[in-house]
Swiss-Prot record:
Gene Ontology biological-process entries: mitochondrial electron transport, NADH to ubiquinone; mitochondrial respiratory chain complex I assembly
InterPro entries (alphabetical): Complex_I_Subunit_2, NADH_DH_su2_C, NADH_UbQ_OxRdtase_chain2, ND/Mrp_TM
Family (UniProt): Belongs to the complex I subunit 2 family.
Pfam families hit by this protein: NADH_dehy_S2_C, Proton_antipo_M
Top-level taxonomy: Eukaryota, Metazoa, Chordata, Craniata, Vertebrata
Protein's recorded name: NADH-ubiquinone oxidoreductase chain 2
Keyword list, A-Z: Electron transport, Membrane, Mitochondrion, Mitochondrion inner membrane, NAD, Respiratory chain, Translocase, Transmembrane, Transmembrane helix, Transport, Ubiquinone
Role according to the record: Core subunit of the mitochondrial membrane respiratory chain NADH dehydrogenase (Complex I) which catalyzes electron transfer from NADH through the respiratory chain, using ubiquinone as an electron acceptor. Essential for the catalytic activity and assembly of complex I.
Domain of life: Eukaryota
Organism: Saccopteryx bilineata (Greater white-lined bat)
Catalytic activity annotation: a ubiquinone + NADH + 5 H(+)(in) = a ubiquinol + NAD(+) + 4 H(+)(out)
UniProt subunit comment: Core subunit of respiratory chain NADH dehydrogenase (Complex I) which is composed of 45 different subunits. Interacts with TMEM242.
Gene for this chain: MT-ND2
């Protein structure tokens, strides 16, 4: 892609998200979502092939449907309240439709169907944008309207997302699909605590973006897209491979790694609000997510056949993709909790 065009598209994506996050008018919010969606589609088709075109089409159809539902909710609310103000969401019907529309944009169950398919059909760099930056706009709207959200609906969607995110990743060998299902599960964790403690949702989002960004960057450095290609990294870059597997365990929520921190805090907050049954179900379902990451780590490190390239001086060219910020990201993505245990006191 032409660097000038790429820069313009990225600026439009950032501008669209910024408009959504800073506007107090429903029409401006809808316009920001549309700008963001139309600018992201060329990024998804950066590698011009049938798979990426199919992924971009699925993404467009899903997001267009969600935008239509969003506008429907805005119009219902306008007829009920008579104003376009962002914070005035008083109609229960409008609130339910709005939650469903934003859940579809985020990839919450039962509207999760597009996330694995789209992520699998695009490049790793585009997948990074899709699973991190594209979550900011809908989550920011949910954050502001959280007092008006239907509690039963959002808890049902979050519980389904955590369960589907765990079950869906069990039989996957494609790393992008594994991260897509992990994203669905993490969105479920964020949505579950949104009504009770919106600030904790932001902390969870920050840690999720940190861990997912680091994982994608490691995959891009190693050019790994499957579990088999991940196992072949041992001879060429053992440190990168070890870091990748550790961060994936952190994404699964293995204590005492960073990924355990948001799960621990969310379960603690749900228990404080007398949602003990929900907290127990979420903790049990989270084991599915941890299981497929542990199985992936075990299979990649201990059960793969050894490769024949054991020479000290390898014929491969040096990797040019090394990034200076990677060591810091790896440390933050793995041992934030042991380094700063006082973060658990945040509310």
């Amino acid at each position: 892609m032409n660097p000038l065009i790429f820069t313009m598209i990225m600026l439009t994506v950032i501008l669209g998200t910024t408009i959504v996050m800073m506007s107090s008018h429903w029409l401006m919010i809808w316009m920001g979502f549309e700008m963001n969606m139309l600018a992201v589609i060329p990024l998804l088709m950066k590698q011009y092939n049938p798979r990426s075109m199919e992924a971009a089409t699925k993404y467009f159809l899903t997001q267009a449907t969600a935008s239509m539902l969003l506008m429907l909710a805005v119009i219902i609310n306008l007829l009920y309240s008579g104003q376009w103000t962002f914070t005035k969401l008083m109609n229960p019907t409008a609130s339910i439709i709005m939650t469903l529309a934003l859940g579809m944009k985020m990839g919450l169950a039962p509207f999760h169907f597009w996330v694995p398919e789209v992520t699998q059909g695009i490049s790793l760099s585009s997948g990074l944008i899709l699973l991190t930056w594209q979550k900011l706009a809908p989550l920011s709207v949910l954050y502001v309207i959280s007092p008006a959200i239907n509690l039963d609906l959002i808890l049902l969607m979050s519980m389904m997302s955590i369960a589907i995110g765990g079950w869906g990743g069990l039989n996957q060998t494609q790393l992008r699909k594994i991260l897509a299902y992990s994203s669905i599960a993490h969105m479920g964790w964020m949505a579950s605590i949104l009504v009770f403690n919106p600030t904790m949702t932001l902390l969870n989002l920050l840690l999720y973006i940190l861990m997912t960004t680091t994982t994608f960057m490691l995959f891009m450095v190693a050019s790994a897209t499957t579990t088999l290609s991940l196992s072949h990294m041992w001879n060429k870059m053992p440190l990168i491979t070890t870091s990748t597997l550790t961060i994936m365990l952190s994404l699964g929520g293995l204590p005492p790694l960073t990924g355990f921190l948001p799960k621990w805090m969310i379960i603690q907050e749900l228990t404080k609000n007398n949602n003990i049954t929900l907290a127990t179900l979420m903790a049990i379902t989270a084991l599915l997510n941890l299981f497929f990451y542990m199985r992936l780590t075990y299979a990649t490190s201990l059960t793969m056949f050894p490769t024949t390239n054991n020479m000290k001086m390898k014929w491969q060219f040096n990797n040019k993709k090394q990034l200076k910020c990677l060591p810091v990201l790896i440390i933050l993505s793995t041992i934030t909790l042991p380094l700063a245990p006082a973060i658990t006191l945040l509310n």
